[in-house]
Amino acid sequence: MHQVLQWLGGGFYLLNKIFLSFSEHARNRGDEAKARRWRIASWAVYIVGLPPWVIILVSWRNWIAASVEASGAPAMVLGLVIALRGTTKNPPRWLDHLALVCIPLGFGYSLYDFGGITTINQWLEIGLVLGFLVGTYLLAKERASGYLWYVLMHVTCGWLMWIQGYPWLFLQQLVSLVFIVDAYRMTQKRRVPR
């Protein structure tokens, strides 16, 4: 069962990063319509990949990461809504507020369950959480700095998956880094005058 969850969660999350990279390449070519389609696809597959990830994290008692991953759903939906609308103006505020409620709940439960921050896994989860929440929020708002936060997320999540015996998810994190760096590089090319 965990193998299937790895392939589903890891596969859809990897597609998200690939599609984000394709979107940035299309923007650099001046094809905003194609960039928007890739961005819509990227947020859609991200949402589909969420449940397998949450199940995996819960099964290892990674409460911080699991609750934050689940609380990232509103930011993912926000990204999809913004991509569908084609504008970052007037996003639904309730999505932001909903995500913020889930974060302290997961963190608090992890502290309760483990009696404080007592494991390397919890420290890795904190890095994963920061990268995921800040990165997803910034990318939903179409801000390039979100890619840098995703680097933190992928490094800490990859390490966590490695030590917990999920080689496919570890590999998926490494491959995702390639696409994240590429997407960020594309945003920087647009900023440099030719």
Question: Which stretches of residues belong to each language-model region?
Answer:
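Alpha-helical membrane-protein topology signature
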Residues: 1-194
